[in-house]
């Protein structure tokens, strides 16, 4: 894989000269091979190594380069026609491939080629962009969007209309990451490379970017770009220094462990935020 990485890095340094008509056979194949690794889950844009998330920037660069080597082409889903550079992940799947993959793909769900969808994943009518990784047992509910190169852990629930930000537009340095066993409530948005750590519960309508204040009401601590493990987060506001106004913030109302989550349930956790 090191040779492939080197070729992608060199191509990236010369990306301004790459187009569908000028790209060499070797570089084009390297980009395709990198996307195949992402599509199969053999490689991913980010992975946790020794407790820390490591971003493989060369794979993100391969995703970006793929847009330079392809022309738009007509494609269809049997009902509608589309015109795009990126083929759909499941367009050529056979029934046997679906069985082996172990996922459920509901009509009108869309996943782009170069994304990975694990076993026991359920894709309701939703969108999974190129380079994304959706791990085993995750539910991507109706109208949820998993952005380019986003990393979604095992047994995550992305509720209806959730948006998980990508890295391509606008260009971001690091992907947005949702770790294992997280719950993201309906219409919430997590973007700009924010990391939601394992077991966190995000209520409905919470918006978190790198600049969003994430206030822990128990400790008074303010986090940026990271939701701590086991945090239960709701939308709220914090006052300005002069008290003249308040600005939006995400509020950590409590922290729970996995055992408590399993015993109590998500809805009970969110209903009881003022009980303590």
Swiss-Prot record:
Pfam families: Hexapep_2 (PF14602), THDPS_N_2 (PF14805). Its EC number is 2.3.1.117. Gene3D superfamilies: Hexapeptide repeat proteins, Tetrahydrodipicolinate-N-succinyltransferase, N-terminal domain. GO terms for cellular component: cytoplasm. One of its GO terms (biological process) is lysine biosynthetic process via diaminopimelate. It is an enzyme of class 2 (transferase). It is found in: Cytoplasm. Pathway: Amino-acid biosynthesis; L-lysine biosynthesis via DAP pathway; LL-2,6-diaminopimelate from (S)-tetrahydrodipicolinate (succinylase route): step 1/3. It catalyses: (S)-2,3,4,5-tetrahydrodipicolinate + succinyl-CoA + H2O = (S)-2-succinylamino-6-oxoheptanedioate + CoA. SUPFAM superfamilies: Trimeric LpxA-like enzymes. One of its GO terms (molecular function) is nucleotidyltransferase activity. Substrate binds at residues 104, 141. PANTHER family: 2,3,4,5-TETRAHYDROPYRIDINE-2,6-DICARBOXYLATE N-SUCCINYLTRANSFERASE, MOLYBDENUM COFACTOR GUANYLYLTRANSFERASE. HAMAP family: DapD. This is 2,3,4,5-tetrahydropyridine-2,6-dicarboxylate N-succinyltransferase. The lineage of its organism: Bacteria, Pseudomonadati, Pseudomonadota, Gammaproteobacteria, Alteromonadales.
């Amino acid at each position: 894989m090191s040779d492939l990485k080197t070729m992608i890095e060199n191509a990236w340094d010369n990306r301004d000269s790459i187009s569908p008509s000028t790209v060499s056979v070797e570089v084009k194949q390297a980009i395709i091979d990198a996307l195949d690794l992402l599509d199969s889950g053999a490689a991913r844009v980010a992975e946790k190594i020794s407790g820390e998330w490591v971003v493989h920037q060369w794979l993100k660069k391969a995703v970006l380069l793929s847009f330079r080597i392809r022309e738009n082409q007509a494609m269809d889903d049997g009902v509608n026609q589309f015109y795009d550079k990126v083929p759909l992940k499941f367009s050529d799947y056979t029934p046997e491939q679906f069985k082996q993959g172990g996922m459920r793909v509901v009509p009108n769900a869309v996943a782009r080629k170069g994304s990975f969808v694990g076993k026991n994943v359920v894709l309701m009518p939703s969108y999974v962009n190129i380079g994304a990784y959706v791990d085993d047992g995750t539910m991507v509910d109706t109208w949820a969007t998993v952005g380019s190169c986003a990393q979604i852990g095992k047994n995550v629930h992305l509720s209806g209309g959730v948006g998980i930000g990508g890295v391509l537009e606008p260009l971001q340095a690091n992907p947005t990451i949702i770790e294992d066993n997280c719950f993201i409530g309906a219409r919430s948005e997590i973007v700009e490379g924010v990391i939601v750590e394992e077991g966190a519960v995000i209520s409905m309508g919470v918006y978190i970017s790198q600049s969003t204040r994430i206030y822990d009401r128990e400790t008074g601590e303010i986090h940026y770009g990271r939701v701590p493990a086991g945090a239960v987060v709701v939308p709220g506001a914090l006052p300005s220094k002069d008290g003249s106004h308040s600005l939006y913030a995400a509020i950590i109302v409590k922290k729970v462990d996995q055992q408590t989550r399993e015993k109590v349930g998500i809805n009970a956790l969110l209903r009881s935020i003022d009980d303590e």
